Each structure stands twice: as C-alpha cells, then as structure tokens.
Amino acid sequence: MLNEDSVYEIAFHSTKQNLVRWEDNLSNREQTFNHFDVLFPNARQIHSIVQSGLTSFGSNWEKLAYDLASANGYKTFEKNDFNKNVPVISEDLKEFQQKMRRKFETEDVTLDKAIDEIRKFIIQNKLSSTERKKVESGKGIDFWFEKDGVELIGDIKSPQENIGNGKKLAEHILIWATYRLMDEPMTEIEAVIAFPYNPYADFETYMSLQGQKFAPMKTGTDYLIADQFWEKLSGVANSTKIIFDAFEALSQSEQILRIKQTIADLSQAK
C-alpha cells in the first residue's frame, strides 16, 4: 500500500529519469528556423527548447501512471499490446457502436450504459473476430491496468482541450471498450480520459472554463482531473500536490540547474 512518502519518491525518481532522457536529447536536437528567429531570436530558441520538453513530459505522465499503479497493486499491460493488436470490427457492430455514440450525444444513455449495450450486442449476436489490426492513428490508449477484476484503460490528454473535443473523446472511449469486449465479452471495463493536473486555481474554475468542452461527458467517471486520476491509481489523497512537491524539489537540483544552463547556451547558438 502506498503512502504520501512513497508517492513522492515514485514521482521524484520517475520524473528525474524523464529529465535525464530529455537532457541527453537536447544536445542532439536539430535546430530549425522561422520568422520569429528574426524578430525575437533568443526567445524563439528558448520556446522551441521548452516546447520539446513539454512534449517529452507527456511520456512522463504515462510512466508515472504505470509506476504508481504497479506499486498500488494494479496489474499493468503494455499499451502497445492493445494499440497494435485489436480485433477487426464487423460492420454491424460498427453501426451499433455509432448508434450508441449518437444516443450518448443526445444524453439518452451514459457512456457506462452505452458500453453495457455494446457488450450485450456482442454476446447476443455471438460476435468474434480472428483478424487483427492496429488501432487507427490518434485513437490509441496511453495506459491499461487491471485491479479487482476491473480493467482501467484510457488516454492522458492536455487539460485544456479544444471546444467540442468531448464528442471525439467519448467516441474513443466507446472504440476502446468495443475492442476489449470483442476479445473478452465479460470483462468489466472502466475507460476514461485522464487530465494529469488542473491548470487553474481550483476545480470550480476549471469546470466553468473547460467543462463545457467535454459535454456530455461527466467528470469523475468519463474523464478524471488531477486527484481524480492520481488518487485512483495511488490510493493516496492529495496525490497531485505530492507529485508537484516532487517537481518542486527537482527544480532545485543540480540536474535542473545544468539543464537551465544548456538551454541558455543553446538559445545563444547561431
């Protein structure tokens, strides 16, 4: 069982490893040019470097999720065992899946209910598939865990999504569930979108500014924000703050100071 100290240690070491990989790649990055190099040369180079770090950090959230889940007793599966090997879906099942998507969008069913209806359709029609394929680009998962007979699968996204993305993300959830139920019709599935942190001062502000983008998805069930996600994986309250405390400690480390100097040097390079 995890506690505050173990969550902190896992977050610290997982993030440190990610920073080491990013630092190693910094010196090998291919320098590019655009018009802002003329207008704001140093700032543009710093932005480019930091943007690469933000992109790299996406893999850190995934690794941290796996590390915490594993330490808290979840069985973990490689995401590519799913993304590169799903059953081919028949046209009638695709049509039924889309029917459930439309019913969800008109709020006639919840996502959980839609998944249960897809399960019933597969079982009643005795559907199976021997053909395999890769998940379509952009529709794969970032994590796949199991605990107490329930599979948790999902994607980790930016907490600031575009307007209307809720419908697209909800469709992804139905796609993932359909693939798993074709392979294991009796599997209990919790398919979610995870946002690793709240960029605003509090939850209420987040929901007022971002929540409408995900309608009719429901927070806490269909998408998980910050502690809703990390506490689910770790079993420890206030996990997001603990994770960011680890980041704060890393910000004062020799490694970060070295990276800051590397960024400064690269931004001056011509």
Where are the regions a protein language model picked out?
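Domain-level recognition of nuclease-like catalytic cores that cleave nucleotide substrates
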Residues: 163, 189-270
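Mg2+/Mn2+-dependent nuclease catalytic core
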Residues: 159-183
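Active-site metal-binding core of divalent-cation-utilizing nuclease and nuclease-like domains
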Residues: 81-148
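Conserved catalytic cores of phosphodiester-cleaving nucleases, focusing on short active-site segments
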Residues: 69, 141-160
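Extended alpha-helical scaffold and adjacent linker segments that couple domains
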Residues: 5, 9, 130-133, 194-198
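Surface-exposed cleft-lining segments at the edges of enzyme active sites
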Residues: 50-51, 125-132, 156-164
